Amino acid sequence: MEPQIENRARATCAVETTLAVIGGRWKVLIIRELFPSVKRFGELHRALQGITQKMLTQQLREMEQDGLVHRQVYLQVPPKVEYSLTPLGTTLKPILNSMHEWGTKFLEGQESAQP
């Protein structure tokens, strides 16, 4: 499957391209949930407080089209579907680690600025 970013208008810089692929409220959080292990839809839905099933489905489909997420369907009754990161998706780990470090420092700065 060809990554969806190829079908979008070319972004003018690498940061813009990254945001086009993983931007939005939910994608980075979904990726974070998939780093430790393969997850089923229900596990993701429970882990992401506030996301609707429709939005989770949409975000997973977009990430699958972009080549970040693999969707494995098992032909059984009841149907079983698992989601995991592709090798391309796992390359985002250093970015998420940096975001975690930055967020931690930011929160510490906010707390120390409180009277």
Which role does the model predict for each range below?
Residues 2, 47, 59, 106-113:
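Catalytic cores of transferase enzymes with a strong primary signal for eukaryotic protein kinases
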Residues 75-99:
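Basic, amphipathic "hinge/linker" alpha-helix immediately C-terminal to the N-terminal HTH DNA-binding motif
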Residues 28, 66, 95-110:
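Alpha-helical linker/hinge and terminal dimerization helices associated
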